[in-house]
C-alpha cells in the first residue's frame, strides 16, 4: 500500500499534534454533487451503485477532486448488513429503504444467519480495496457500519420510522428477542468492520442514527451495550498504525461520558451539543468530531465562515478535533457553499495549533 501523505485526520483522532484542524463531511459523496447524479443515473439505482466497485470508487473520489478534504469515506450504506442477512432491501420513491421480509418475530430472528463479509458482502470489500488503491496514499479511507440498535430499527420496523413503535414494543414486551437480534447484529458488524480493515480502511465509524430515540436507561441496554461489544472485537492495528474508532449517536449528547468509556478513540457530535462543553466533559479521554448544523450550508459563505470560526473557538487550542457537520450534508446544498465550509476550517484553524 502507498505511504499516507496526509495523516492529519488519523493524528487528530489519536490526539496527536496537527498543523490545522482536519475536515471531512458525512455524506460527502452524494446527491448535492452534479457529478454524483450522473454516475447514479449510469448505475440505474442506489444499490447497483453500491455493488459496482468501480462506480463506488468513482463517487467516493468525486468530493476529493473538488475539495481539500482530509479523509475519504467508503461509499456504501448502513443497510448492507441486514440486506446480506436476506431481508430483501429495496428503496421506494419518497419512502426511503424498505425490507421485503422484516425481522419482527422471535422465529424470524432465530433464522437469521451472520453474513460472511468476504462472500455476501464481498462487493463492499472489492470497493474498499479499489478505493484504497486509487487514493494512492493521498488521504485515509474511513470504513463504517450502522450500530446494532440502528440496524435493528430498520429490520423490525420494515424500513424507516418516525415513532419506532414496533421495535420499542419488542424492547419492552419481548426484550429477550431484541437482545438476540442485537447480539447477532453486533457479531455481524465486528466481522464486517474487521474485513473492511483487512481490505484497506484506515479508520472506522459506527453510526448510531437512532440511539437518540431511546430513554436514558434503554440507550445503555439496547444501544451502547452492543457498540461496546463491537469496540471490544475490532482490529485496532493495521499497516503499522492504530485504526481509530469513532462512535456517533445522533441525539446522544446525554451519554457522552458513557460512550467515552467504551474504549473508542473519538465521539461524533450532532449540532445540538456545544463542542466546548463536550470537550470539558470527555476531551481528556477521546477526540471529538463535529459539529456544524448541516443546514448552515444554506447560508452565505460569509455566514458559514463565521460559524466555523465560532465552533473552532468553542473547541479551543490543541488537537483532538476533527471538523465535520453534525449529520449528513443535505442534497440541495450548493457545492460552492460546501467548498467555503472546508476552506474556512483550514484557513481559520491554524492559530489553534501553534
UniProtKB/Swiss-Prot annotation:
Family per similarity comment: Belongs to the uroporphyrinogen decarboxylase family.
GO CC terms in record: cytosol
GO molecular function: uroporphyrinogen decarboxylase activity
Upper lineage: Bacteria, Pseudomonadati, Pseudomonadota, Gammaproteobacteria, Alteromonadales
A Pfam family assignment: URO-D
Gene this chain is encoded by: hemE
Residues under site feature: Transition state stabilizer: 77
Residues given in the record as substrate binding sites: 27-31, 77, 154, 209, 327
Entry's Gene Ontology BP terms: protoporphyrinogen IX biosynthetic process from glutamate
Function as written in the Swiss-Prot or TrEMBL entry: Catalyzes the decarboxylation of four acetate groups of uroporphyrinogen-III to yield coproporphyrinogen-III.
SUPFAM superfamilies: UROD/MetE-like
Catalytic reactions on record: uroporphyrinogen III + 4 H(+) = coproporphyrinogen III + 4 CO2
Subcellular location, record wording: Cytoplasm
Keyword Lyase (UniProt): yes
Main location: cytoplasm
Organism (species): Shewanella frigidimarina (strain NCIMB 400)
Subunit composition and interactions: Homodimer.
Recorded superkingdom: Bacteria
Alphabetical UniProt keywords: Cytoplasm, Decarboxylase, Lyase, Porphyrin biosynthesis
Annotated EC: 4.1.1.37
Protein name from the UniProt record: Uroporphyrinogen decarboxylase
Pathway(s): Porphyrin-containing compound metabolism; protoporphyrin-IX biosynthesis; coproporphyrinogen-III from 5-aminolevulinate: step 4/4
Amino acid at each position: 500500500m502507498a505511504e499516507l501523505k496526509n495523516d492529519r485526520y488519523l493524528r487528530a483522532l489519536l490526539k496527536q499534534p496537527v498543523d490545522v484542524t482536519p475536515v471531512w463531511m458525512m455524506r460527502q459523496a452524494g446527491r448535492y454533487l452534479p457529478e454524483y447524479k450522473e454516475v447514479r443515473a449510469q448505475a440505474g439505482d442506489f444499490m447497483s451503485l453500491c455493488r459496482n466497485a468501480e462506480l463506488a470508487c468513482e463517487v467516493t473520489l468525486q468530493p476529493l477532486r473538488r475539495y481539500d478534504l482530509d479523509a475519504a469515506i467508503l461509499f456504501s450504506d448502513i443497510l448492507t448488513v441486514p440486506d446480506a442477512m436476506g431481508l430483501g432491501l429495496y428503496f421506494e420513491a419518497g419512502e426511503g429503504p424498505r425490507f421485503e421480509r422484516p425481522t419482527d418475530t422471535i422465529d424470524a430472528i432465530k433464522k437469521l444467519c451472520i453474513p460472511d463479509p468476504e462472500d455476501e458482502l464481498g462487493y463492499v470489500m472489492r470497493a474498499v480495496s479499489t478505493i484504497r488503491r486509487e487514493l494512492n496514499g493521498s488521504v485515509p479511507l474511513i470504513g463504517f457500519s450502522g450500530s446494532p440498535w440502528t440496524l435493528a430499527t430498520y429490520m423490525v420496523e420494515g424500513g424507516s420510522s418516525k415513532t419506532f413503535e414496533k421495535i420499542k414494543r419488542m424492547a419492552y414486551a419481548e426484550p429477550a428477542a431484541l437482545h438476540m437480534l442485537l447480539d447477532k447484529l453486533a457479531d455481524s458488524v465486528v466481522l464486517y468492520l474487521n474485513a473492511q480493515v483487512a481490505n484497506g480502511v484506515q479508520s472506522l465509524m459506527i453510526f448510531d442514527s437512532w440511539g437518540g430515540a431511546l430513554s436514558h436507561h434503554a440507550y445503555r441496554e439496547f444501544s451502547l451495550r452492543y457498540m461496546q461489544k463491537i469496540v471490544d472485537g475490532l482490529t485496532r492495528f493495521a499497516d503499522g498504525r492504530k485504526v481509530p474508532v469513532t462512535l456517533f449517536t445522533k441525539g446522544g449528547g446525554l451519554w457522552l461520558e458513557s460512550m467515552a468509556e467504551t474504549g473508542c478513540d473519538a465521539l461524533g457530535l450532532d449540532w445540538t451539543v456545544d463542542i466546548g462543553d463536550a470537550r470539558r466533559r470527555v476531551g481528556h479521554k477521546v477526540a471529538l468530531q463535529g459539529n456544524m448544523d448541516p443546514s448552515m450550508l444554506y447560508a452565505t459563505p460569509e455566514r458559514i465562515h463565521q460559524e466555523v470560526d465560532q465552533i473552532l473557538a468553542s473547541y479551543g487550542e490543541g488537537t483532538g478535533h476533527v471538523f465535520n457537520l453534525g449529520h449528513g450534508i443535505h442534497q440541495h446544498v450548493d457545492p460552492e457553499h460546501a467548498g467555503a465550509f472546508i476552506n474556512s476550517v483550514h484557513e481559520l484553524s491554524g492559530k489553534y495549533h501553534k
